[in-house]
């Protein structure tokens, strides 16, 4: 009697399915999905467009170099975060909590731009139309930065913070057990389901015709 054929091992395939280029493609799609669905990509795109338009307006007239330097700095930082999320580079640097860095950048961007408006106002006595247009664009950019800052609150939910803590390696560079993340997610899903059932029972008790 012939010996039974050995079973194919599928565990290694599942383990390695997110490595290499296929893994990067998955991270690329998932990162861009979150980046665009949460509104950060739209805000950063508008910020970069407005900053470029403001620089063009200021370069048409005599402008203090500090104003141009400020706009160039903010444009560079915004472009850095845009390509960081678009190319999924943040997924491969897990020891940095990028939402916190992005929040600090939005706060600094709005603060510097508002300060730059007052500085540009004091730098000239006469305000030509291109100069005034650049100041208005700086104000709109600061407002959009505040909107992007408010959108960051979704990243600071307890579930995402716990996920980040579990994915962060320890001092020796070793990552935590991935089973802890699965157990935590299952527990939170069960708590959410119990909460929904309790709310449904409460509505039924208040409305007999429910």
UniProtKB/Swiss-Prot annotation:
The GO annotation for biological process reads: chemotaxis
Q: Which UniProt keywords apply?
A: Chemotaxis, Cytokine, Membrane, Transmembrane, Transmembrane helix
Query: What topology in the membrane does the UniProt record assign?
Result: Multi-pass membrane protein
Q: Which InterPro entries match?
A: Marvel
Residues annotated as transmembrane: 35-55, 65-85, 103-123, 127-147
Q: Does the keyword Nucleus apply?
A: no
- The keyword Zinc-finger is annotated on this UniProt entry: no
Which residues belong to any copy of the MARVEL domain?
Answer: 35-157
Gene Ontology terms, MF aspect: cytokine activity
Which GO cellular component term is one of those annotated?
membrane
- Subcellular location as annotated: Membrane
Q: Which domain of life is it from?
A: Eukaryota
Q: Family, per the entry?
A: Belongs to the chemokine-like factor family.
Please state what the protein is called: CKLF-like MARVEL transmembrane domain-containing protein 2B
Q: Which organism is it from?
A: Mus musculus
Taxon lineage: Eukaryota, Metazoa, Chordata, Craniata, Vertebrata
Q: Point out the gene that encodes the protein.
A: Cmtm2b
């Amino acid at each position: 009697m012939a010996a039974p054929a050995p079973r194919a091992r599928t565990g290694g395939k599942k383990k390695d399915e997110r490595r290499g280029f296929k893994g990067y493609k998955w991270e690329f799609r998932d990162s861009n999905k979150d980046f665009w669905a949460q509104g950060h990509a739209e805000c950063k795109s508008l910020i970069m467009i407005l900053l470029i338009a403001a620089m063009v307006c200021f370069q048409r007239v005599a402008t203090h170099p500090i104003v141009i330097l400020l706009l160039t700095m903010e444009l560079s930082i915004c472009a850095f975060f845009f390509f960081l999320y678009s190319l999924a580079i943040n997924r491969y640097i897990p020891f940095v909590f990028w939402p916190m860095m992005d929040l600090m950048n939005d706060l600094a961007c709005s603060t510097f731009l508002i300060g730059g408006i007052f500085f540009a106002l004091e730098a000239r006595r006469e305000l030509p139309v291109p100069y005034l247009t650049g100041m208005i664009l700086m104000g709109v950019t600061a407002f959009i930065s505040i909107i992007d800052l408010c959108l960051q609150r979704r990243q600071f939910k307890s579930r995402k913070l716990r996920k980040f803590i579990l994915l962060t390696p320890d001092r020796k560079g070793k990552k935590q057990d991935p089973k802890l993340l699965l157990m935590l997610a299952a527990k939170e899903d069960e708590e959410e389901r119990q909460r929904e059932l309790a709310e449904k029972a409460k509505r039924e008790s208040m409305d007999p015709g429910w």
